UniProtKB/Swiss-Prot annotation:
It comes from Vipera aspis aspis. Disulfide bonds join C42-C131, C44-C60, C59-C111, C65-C138, C66-C104, C73-C97, C91-C102. It is an enzyme of class 3 (hydrolase). Keywords: Calcium, Disulfide bond, Hydrolase, Lipid degradation, Lipid metabolism, Metal-binding, Neurotoxin, Postsynaptic neurotoxin, Presynaptic neurotoxin, Secreted, Signal, Toxin. Binds 1 Ca(2+) ion. Its cofactor is Ca(2+). Transmembrane segments: none annotated. Heterodimer: postsynaptic neurotoxin. Monomer: snake venom phospholipase A2 (PLA2) that shows postsynaptic neurotoxicity. PLA2 catalyzes the calcium-dependent hydrolysis of the 2-acyl groups in 3-sn-phosphoglycerides. It catalyses: a 1,2-diacyl-sn-glycero-3-phosphocholine + H2O = a 1-acyl-sn-glycero-3-phosphocholine + a fatty acid + H(+). GO terms for cellular component: extracellular region. PROSITE patterns: PA2_ASP, PA2_HIS. Heterodimer of a weakly toxic basic protein having phospholipase A2 activity (B chain (AC Q8JFG1)) and a non-toxic acidic protein functioning as its inhibitor (A chain). This is Basic phospholipase A2 vaspin B chain.
Amino acid sequence: MRILWIVAVCLIGVEGNLFQFAKMINGKLGAFSVWNYISYGCYCGWGGQGTPKDATDRCCFVHDCCYGRVRGCNPKLAIYSYSFKKGNIVCGKNNGCLRDICECDRVAANCFHQNKNTYNKNYRFLSSSRCRQTSEQC
C-alpha cells in the first residue's frame, strides 16, 4: 500500500496537493527530505494503523487525522496557494477546504522540522506487522 503513495506522487507530476506537501517538507528540511517520510513508522505513507512509533510518526498520525476532517474536496489532489516567507510556510488566500488542506500540510511540515531529532532510521520501511496494535482515535 505504501508503494501506492510513491506512485501517486510520481503520477501527479508538478501539480496536486501531495506534490505541494512534498515541497513544503523539502523547504523546511532540505532538498529530497520528503523521501525520508514516504514510508516511515506506522503512519507516514499510505494508510496507517497502530500506535505511532515516535514524535515523527505522530506528525503523520496527526496529519492523517487532519485530512480526515477536511470536507468539500480531496485533500490529496486539491491545489492550494502557499509560499515561504523567511523560512516559514504561509498559506495563501485559500477558501474552505483548500485553506484546511494547506493548514494540515503546513502543520505537518513544521512538525517534522520540530521533531527531526526523533527521526529513527530503524522505522523506515517498517513492517506493517509492527503496527498491529489498536489504532488511536483522532
